[in-house]
Curated annotation (Swiss-Prot):
Span list, region Disordered: 371-405
InterPro entries (alphabetical): G_OBG, GTP-bd, GTP-bd_Obg/CgtA, GTP1-OBG_CS, GTP1_OBG_dom, GTP1_OBG_dom_sf, OBG_GTPase, P-loop_NTPase
Entry EC no(s): 3.6.5.-
Superkingdom of origin: Bacteria
Protein's cellular compartments: Cytoplasm
Statement: the UniProt record of this protein carries the keyword ATP-binding: no
Listed Pfam families: GTP1_OBG, MMR_HSR1
Descriptive protein name: GTPase Obg
Amino acid sequence: MRFIDEAVVTVKAGDGGNGIASFRREKYVPRGGPDGGDGGKGGDVYVIAEDNTNTLVDYRYTRRHDAMRAENGHSRNCSGKGSDDLFLPVPIGTTVVDTETDEVLGDLIEIGQTLLIAKGGDGGLGNTHFKSSTNQAPRKATSGFEGELKVLKFELKVVADVGLIGLPNAGKSTFIRQVSAARPKVADYPFTTLVPNLGVVDIGRHRSFVMADIPGLIEGASEGAGLGIRFLKHVARTRRLLHLVDIKPIDGSDPVENARVILNELERFSPELANLPQILVLNKIDQVPEEELNELCTHIVAELGWTGIVFRTATLTGEGVDAIKYHLMNEIEREREREIEDPIFADAQKARFERLEAEVRLNTEAQREAYRAARKAAREGTDLSDDDFDDSDDDDDGVEVVYAP
């Protein structure tokens, strides 16, 4: 199944049923008076977060979703039947945005969470409501109200506690295979991973967190190179970043410069994102002679001016992986507990994530508009530099993001 993380849909809530004008007709009851019932209420449209879907691909092919119209009223003061509400299933981590106002209607981050996105119309009134002392036989009834019509954008961001970042072939997919049951494709060429992969890292009884393997970034990604920022937005909901650096690249490149590329791209794309807590992981230590390893790792850390936490691993053999798992679990648990115990800290965390998501959304849309303008100019014959931005409408990837237990 294709991984689709954006879709624009049109939703129409159900129209309300019409009220009717009718009169009581019963033997031995002359001038029975009005008995027209009201119309039913039109169905609302909701989105509901489900864990059995991980892509918005269905909304690429079915872009219009209408709730049913309610029934008209009936005689004998019987109201018409309201129409059923329409529920649109979306993956956990979906944000709903009104395309006309750019208002964020809500985020769905829990299984079963629902969000009202279009309200059904109220039913019309039957002629019973218009009876008065001067008008005992009203023939007036009102029509039902129309349901809301909206054009919305669904944006999917994977929900993970930890985001794996690094250049292509840094060992991210191998790492997530080591720590979870996720099985992303692994190969010795760049861009093996084309879509985010999620894995649940199980530490023990009731202790686990979710890790996301984000497709590799390259220099210029914030301006559209390679996979561009197409999937960088998926780290917007992570608590911290795990930055993997290949200390012995097969192409002979400098690991220090490779690490700086990622740090610079994060800063260019979103300063708020670059300020997330980061852990540096020096990977593939099994590829360096033991007598040279300590000197090389010390050199990399010093050249980067890194003052944060550093781990050394060999993801292929699993060396050093457990230490990272337990460190991450302890940090995440402390943060979760503090959010529960300290309302001020919880509010600050929420505000930070809201700022981050707003910044990511703004930057993503700005780059998409620049890409569209460049493509339009190219069609008109303007000489433009090559633009490799991967527009979401042209996504042909064939992999689905899957939660692995």
